[in-house]
């Protein structure tokens, strides 16, 4: 049966770093307050001239180079983002133009912080159903600093900018089947519940004429995040007849170290098997998981043949997970 696997990863972070002490000069907070409650020490901020598509393209080039493929071989491009360059066209088609990728079809996915999970799931389904797609480029890219209220200390300390990308390959185009037969996306699950008020923007194009700024009910988000991330992982294990001890690594959405620790405790998982970049990247929304995945593979904390789970939750609420063998 045709399936997909992650061939390569890439990432891009803007040059500017914004530390907690610098934020403390903007709002009433402190490095200690931010660290204790979130685990975040810094975040990256895009230059005024940078667009989300620029971040996406830079991460894509990194992944394409590692995959050692031509852009002409890419048949599908999906960009997961909440902060596109324009209302239309999609960020994916803009990135496609900048990459000079002529043979793909492209579109955006908007599922907030769960966007990359949604995008990988869609790409996997399209690869399985379309033998003509040899390679898919899946990107999570965000400039969250543009929709943050920098006067709201409860949210402005949480977010950062960045992009991560993966090249997914179809096994229908593999000559090296003995090498890649065990690699691949094994299962995915996606959910949403329409609980829109706990995490949203105060405004939008059709309601206020602008993108709006982020609003969050922190306590409610924490409770939902811990319960839903845990349940998604448990469902993945149940559906695949696995135990938590079978999992070699976990890449959770990098929102808050306290959420990650609470999920790990409920699962009775080992914290040393968890990929954690929230301290350096902060919450980069849809870019969070591909950034962390690329970091872990480069270290290498994720090694070929290992079994792992990607899991995220975002506004909507939306959540889900991907089980894969790298």
From Swiss-Prot:
Report the locations given in the UniProt record.
Cytoplasm
Task: Provide the primary localization.
Answer: cytoplasm
Under SUPFAM superfamilies, the record lists: Thiolase-like
Name of the top EC class for this enzyme:
transferase
Q: Quote the catalytic residue positions.
A: 113, 253, 283
Provide the catalytic activity annotation: malonyl-[ACP] + acetyl-CoA + H(+) = 3-oxobutanoyl-[ACP] + CO2 + CoA
Q: Which Gene3D superfamilies match?
A: 3.40.47.10
Q: What is its EC number?
A: 2.3.1.180
GO aspect biological process, one term: secondary metabolite biosynthetic process
Which Gene Ontology cellular component terms are annotated?
cytoplasm
Spans annotated as ACP-binding: 254-258
Q: Which GO terms describe its molecular function?
A: 3-oxoacyl-[acyl-carrier-protein] synthase activity; beta-ketoacyl-acyl-carrier-protein synthase III activity
Domain of life according to the entry:
Bacteria
Instruction: Give the record's pathway.
Output: Lipid metabolism; fatty acid biosynthesis
Give the UniProt keywords, A-Z: Acyltransferase, Cytoplasm, Fatty acid biosynthesis, Fatty acid metabolism, Lipid biosynthesis, Lipid metabolism, Multifunctional enzyme, Transferase
Q: Which family does it belong to?
A: Belongs to the thiolase-like superfamily. FabH family.
UniProt function note: Catalyzes the condensation reaction of fatty acid synthesis by the addition to an acyl acceptor of two carbons from malonyl-ACP. Catalyzes the first condensation reaction which initiates fatty acid synthesis and may therefore play a role in governing the total rate of fatty acid production. Possesses both acetoacetyl-ACP synthase and acetyl transacylase activities. Its substrate specificity determines the biosynthesis of branched-chain and/or straight-chain of fatty acids.
Complexes and interactors: Homodimer.
Quote the PANTHER family the UniProt record gives.
3-OXOACYL-[ACYL-CARRIER-PROTEIN] SYNTHASE 3, BETA-KETOACYL-[ACYL-CARRIER-PROTEIN] SYNTHASE III
Q: What is known of its domains?
A: The last Arg residue of the ACP-binding site is essential for the weak association between ACP/AcpP and FabH.
- What protein name applies here? Beta-ketoacyl-[acyl-carrier-protein] synthase III
Organism encoding this protein: Wolbachia sp. subsp. Brugia malayi (strain TRS)
């Amino acid at each position: 049966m045709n399936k997909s696997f992650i061939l390569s990863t890439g990432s891009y972070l803007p040059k500017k770093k914004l530390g907690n002490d610098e934020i403390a000069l903007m709002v009433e907070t402190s490095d200690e307050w931010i660290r204790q409650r979130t685990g975040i020490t810094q975040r990256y901020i895009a230059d005024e001239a940078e667009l989300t598509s620029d971040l996406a393209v830079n991460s894509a080039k990194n992944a394409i180079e590692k995959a050692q493929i031509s852009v002409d071989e890419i048949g599908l491009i999906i960009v997961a983002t909440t902060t596109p360059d324009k209302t239309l066209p999609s960020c994916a088609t803009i990135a496609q133009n900048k990459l000079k990728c002529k043979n793909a079809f492209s579109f955006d996915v908007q599922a907030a912080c769960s966007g990359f999970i949604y995008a990988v799931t869609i790409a996997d389904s399209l690869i399985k159903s379309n033998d003509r797609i040899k390679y898919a480029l899946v990107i999570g890219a965000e400039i969250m600093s543009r929709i943050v209220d920098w006067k709201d200390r409860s949210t402005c300390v949480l977010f950062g900018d960045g992009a991560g990308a993966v090249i997914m390959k179809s096994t229908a185009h593999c000559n090296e089947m003995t090498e890649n037969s065990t690699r691949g996306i094994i299962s995915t699950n996606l959910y949403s519940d329409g609980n829109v008020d706990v995490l949203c923007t105060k405004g939008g194009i059709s309601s206020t004429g602008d993108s709006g700024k982020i609003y969050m009910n922190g306590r409610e988000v924490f409770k939902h995040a811990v319960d839903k991330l845990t349940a998604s992982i448990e469902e993945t294990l149940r559906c695949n007849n696995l135990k938590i001890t079978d999992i070699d690594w976990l890449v959770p959405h990098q929102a808050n170290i306290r959420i990650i620790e609470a999920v790990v405790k409920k699962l009775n998982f080992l914290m040393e098997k968890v990929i954690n970049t929230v301290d350096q990247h902060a919450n980069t929304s849809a870019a969070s998981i591909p950034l962390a995945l690329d970091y872990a593979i480069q270290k290498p904390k994720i090694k070929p043949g290992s079994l792992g789970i990607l899991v995220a939750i975002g506004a909507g609420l939306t959540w889900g997970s991907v089980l894969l063998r790298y």
